[in-house]
Amino acid sequence: MIRKSDETPIGRVVATELKPATPHQFHFWTATDTSIGIGSIVKVQGSGVGDQVSGRIVYGVVTDGFAYSDLATPLHDVIGAEGDPAQAAERPTARAEIRLWTAAVLRQIPEEPLQPVPLGAVHVAGDADVAAALRMDGYLNTAQPTAIPVGLYESGGLEAPVYLDADFLLGPEAAHLNISGVSGLATKTSAVEFLLSSIFEHYPAHRGSVAAVCFNVKGPDLLFLDQAGTLDDADRRRYARLGIEPGPFERVHYFAPFKADGVNLNTLRTNAELARTVEPLVWGLIEVLDFAEVLLNRDDIDAKADAFIDFLSDRVVRREFDDGFGGEHRVETFADLERLFRSIFDGLEMASRGDIWRTHHIATIRKVRNRLGNVSTRCKGLVTDDGPASDLPWGRFDDRGVYVIDVANVDPLGQDLVFARVVSKLREHLERRDLGVDAVVVFVDELNKYAPADGVDTYVKKMLLDISERGRYLGLVLFGAEQFRSQVHRRVVGNAGTQVFGRMDSDELATPGYQVLSPATKIKLATLPVGELMVRHPHFTQPIFVRFPRPSVLRGRDGVERFPPAADLPFADAVGLQLVRLDPRVRTNQVKDLIAGHDEVDVRRALAAVRRERPADVLAMLRKRLGVRVGSEPARERSSVQPLGPIAEEPY
């Protein structure tokens, strides 16, 4: 239902020599009991002489307010009451009081010629006025609308839907969203959850398909998006007003690395009712070698080491390779790489050929060997020494699907690796247009940590900068959140076409980036209630306050209470649970009997192969794989790697 503005004026524009009306700002007075407040949208109807003045309509948003009386100085009021406040309240004649408001211009119709705001009556804006003031009519009431509901503008009993333009939110005209606010009170995660549900329901069909990849970096924040939350009547009314059907996300896919034991998942979503929906995230040498820059200390790796790593990536990995000493190798895992290194060192020692192999000095080779050999130890559970990988479904992304990667309990090095590889793979597939969807929203919280304004340029920071500057052309959209916007890299927040602010810290509002806001607007930002946001969008010439309904998904802390995480299982039980996820017909006792007496390393390899191939008969394949090396080559005799002897000239 479209609600029209009240034809009864609530105020009138005034212009004096000290406070004139300009093309971008005007002042108006109202009665003292008005419903107008900071953030209210008003409409001015020109009533002067001439067609341009009488037909001109101006929309504005209130940015400040003042109250006046006829007092020239406070001393007069004190003397009039004889210094007694009680007598002032009993005076027979009340002093005249005026409410004066300052408003910033949102839009003028016609837009040319641009002139000062005319003197005229001021009205409260209705639904159609809000749409016109925010220029939403250009993408809302068209043959192919691109409007995405972001919330409700509320003022004086009016609830008017506010929409964002999908072309400026998800590209190609502009893209990216950034949301700032204090932790816990700004509802940043809730706002992103609601906006994703709005995008999934209202993203125009002619723009193609869309999915979301969310990195869970804090506790259980994003671990229950497939579970329904609790809504009250006010939330349901807001959903209906915005044209959104409340409910949890229908296609949610969860991924998490293993813990150090290699069988228990490193996530809080381990309750028996939900654990089957979490897929392992495990990578090997092939997956991580291209991201050696993330894993290795750049102060410790020089150009020679970089050149040798590139040689391994281009000439050795996944190829039949002759080490020059009569040995044939096919390197696909860290264990294979260790065997190659051992062959090189033994060959050089036996052949007495000095300290150069394929133009690379032995000290450089030892250095790279030591650094790469530590990767699987430092990222244990995420990176495997020997075994197949378990990855996201590249090329098979679902339309309106949400892919949650839980790295909340992963060490910082592992988090950096996950961010770098996942986003890089997204970009590669979007460039080739074979991801399965046309656009992807990447949600990253804690930008203060991953893209700080100061400090060294890490791989993750450079990756986020690349998304914010060039991602919109590919359909790769960054939704970022942080507590302190002033401490995030300027190019990351500056390239966000849509900027959202929740409740802000007063110290943050005192930084130079907020000087464009009026003092009254800053005060409102510092005291915003939960569920209210200030939104800046390319179509909005001024920030607008909106209220959004509570997300219709289970909040993280409520989800942990309803679905308490299970304790880590013993090795055999954890293996059984992994197989039950693949085939509910499997019984844990069968698995225990099958793996009894086998080495845990062999069981992990066999389990990884079963997860990768997902056969019809899970137990039969596990039985076949046990005791057989899982990989691309036949089983070899297992030999322990002897420690390298010290070398006098070894500088590392």
Located regions from the model:
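P-loop NTPase motor domains
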Residues: 204-210, 214-215, 219-225, 247-466, ...
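Short secondary-structure boundary/capping segments
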Residues: 78, 226-240, 269-272, 457-460, ...
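Conserved nucleotide-binding/hydrolysis micro-motifs of P-loop NTPases
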Residues: 33, 48, 66-68, 109-110, ...
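Conserved P-loop NTPase motor module
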Residues: 531-597, 601-610, 632-652
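Conserved ATP-driven motor cores of ASCE-family P-loop NTPases powering translocation/secretion/packaging/pilus
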Residues: 459-461, 465-552
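Basic- and hydrophobic-enriched, low-structure N-terminal and domain-boundary segments
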Residues: 1-182, 190, 195-198, 202-209, ...
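Conserved beta-strand position immediately N-terminal to the Walker
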Residues: 177-178, 405, 479
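Glycine-rich phosphate-binding loop of nucleotide-binding enzymes
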Residues: 153-253, 490, 535, 567-568
